[in-house]
Amino acid sequence: MAIRSSGRKLSFEILSQNSSFENDDTSIRRSSSDPITGNVASESPRDYGKRKRSKKKKKKVNQVETILENGDSHSTIITGSSGDFGETTTMFENRLNYYGGGGSGSSGGGCVVTLLDGQTVHHNGFNFGELRQRNVNGSVDGSNDERWSDTLSSDKKLYMEETSVELSPSENPPFQEVQHQFPRSEINGNVVRRLDTEASLDWKQLVADDPDFLSAETRSPMKYFMEEIYGGISLRSTTTPGNDIERERIYDTIFRLPWRCEVLIDTGFFVCVNSFLSLLTVMPIRVLLIFMDAFKNRQFRRPSASELSDLACFLVLATGTILLGRTDISLIYHMIRGQSTIKLYVVYNILEIFDRLCQSFCGDVFGALFSSAKGLSISPPEKLRFSTWRFVSDLALTMAASILHSFILLAQAITLSTCIVAHNNALLALLVSNNFAEIKSSVFKRFSKDNIHGLVYADSIERFHISAFLVSVLAQNILESEGAWFGNFIYNATTVFFCEMMIDIIKHSFLAKFNDIKPIAYSEFLQALCEQTLNIRPEDRKTNLTFVPLAPACVVIRVLTPVYAAHLPYSPLPWRMLWMVILFVITYIMLTSLKVLIGMGLRKHATWYINRCRRRNSSHLHND
């Protein structure tokens, strides 16, 4: 028999005395972990001879043992008796629990289960107490009946008082469990009270307000249908009414945020174009001035950090252009177009992934190179050798990373050109797969505000790379196409840019919606970009537009060089050299004019927008 005591199970076995073992005492096994007090009262044993003379009488063994566990007063009475008809084992368990934080003591009554001749009578008294009387292989002695009659009657009275149920003395109901919601006590004696949940309270309130609510299933179909018609909103079971905040979110997603996002991406695109033009126009002049100054002074002078950085960039640009010039573009074109293992849009997506990886890595490498150049310029004489080797190693790593990035961009440009000139809707497949894969990889993820800031800058760089690819496609059409090709090129270029713009708007609109980003955040991103344009860079800024235009410049120079070579006149070498110089000067003037126009426009726009943001912050306005 297993007894539950105060939330902890006491495993012990009660071995009742059988009629064939009359000389043995009833044994009780307990676990060693249960402490037993010495309060054990046992009836005095009779003499062996005296028991032999009274064979017709059965011995009576009364053992009263008290087990104190976990602060509970727990008494157990186990009586083994034998009568004329067999043997009966009775156990009474009485506990005294202190609960409610130990403030007040409360003692419980008992529960009596009596098994008589196959019939079971179950009585409930107080909680915590149990009185069980079971018939084993016989009936009950009369002395034991008298012994427990008082207990049964008292428990029955307590049961009637607790449950207010009247039972006749002759009534012998079948076995049934009557459970009461008593407080459940834990091991430490505290009481775990049953708490009603909010849902149950709402349900009780609903039933109290509408007594006919539970009888809805008995109503007629016509009455149900009329209630559905006049009950309110048709979709009230699956939708909830919104508020002004939800309305603002809708208009932010559709109108306000797309405009601000597009302005930010376009501004970032022109910042990339300005950096690209600075590489092609400003940097050659600076390098030329460095050599002229060295030739004029005719003595060695340690260059400054900016001069070392310009020399390193010029060396990387020249090396990448020379290596790409050795590359056969037509061979790569036919290799990509002729293979049938991988689709063109898959190749483009793979190259785009490597492009982003190389863009991030090249930004870090160039940052390390510029830091080494600064260290070399201010290095003391005793550390000059170490600083020089450090600068050379960073320059070699930068050159390798930039050349690898240049080859990836060239392959990506050739793949896009292959899709455009194909006649099997390869461009449409490329745009659909690439753009919707971008939406899938971005929209349904959790982004922080800084991550979205960096994602906007990545979209600006991507648009610049697409522009460089379209320049490559234009150069290829100039060299190889026949007939009216310009209109078809404009249509394809417009399609590519329009799809890219729409995908960026959709992506950022739902990113802002799912991540609870307000449209004012994109205005803050634009303000940070304008401050970067004006070289106002706070030290604690986490996100800046990092763009290294060396790899795109190598690709553009590589694809435009054959176009210039094809339009040179067939004349002697001096005239050809003269025409080359003229074309170079014209191109440089055009690029310089474009650089001045874009640079001044960016600075003017940045100054205006920063002043506007300051006025907005001072007047607490939130509209662009």
UniProtKB/Swiss-Prot annotation:
Organs and tissues of expression: Expressed in inflorescences, siliques, roots and shoots. Expressed in early embryo, endosperm, mature pollen and pollen tubes, synergide cells and weakly in antipodal cells.
Topological type in the membrane: Multi-pass membrane protein
Swiss-Prot/TrEMBL GO biological process terms: embryo development ending in seed dormancy; maintenance of protein localization in endoplasmic reticulum; pollen tube guidance
GO CC terms, sorted: endoplasmic reticulum lumen; membrane
Basic residues: bias regions: 49-61
Segments traversing the membrane: 263-283, 305-325, 391-411, 413-433, 545-565, 578-598
Name of the encoding gene: POD1
Subcellular location: Membrane; Endoplasmic reticulum lumen
Organism expressing this protein natively: Arabidopsis thaliana
Bias kind Polar residues: ranges: 33-42
InterPro entries from the UniProt entry: Tatp1
Record keywords: Endoplasmic reticulum, Membrane, Transmembrane, Transmembrane helix
Name of protein: Protein POLLEN DEFECTIVE IN GUIDANCE 1
Subunit record text: Interacts with CRT3, but not with CRT1 or CNX.
Primary localization class, coarse: membrane
Function according to Swiss-Prot or TrEMBL: Probable component of the calreticulin 3 (CRT3) complex, acting probably as a co-chaperone involved in protein retention in the endoplasmic reticulum lumen. Required for micropylar pollen tube guidance. Plays an essential role in cell plate orientation or positioning in early embryo patterning.
Family according to the record: Belongs to the TAPT1 family.
Effect of a null allele: Defective in micropylar pollen tube guidance leading to zygotic lethality.
Ranges for region Disordered: 20-63
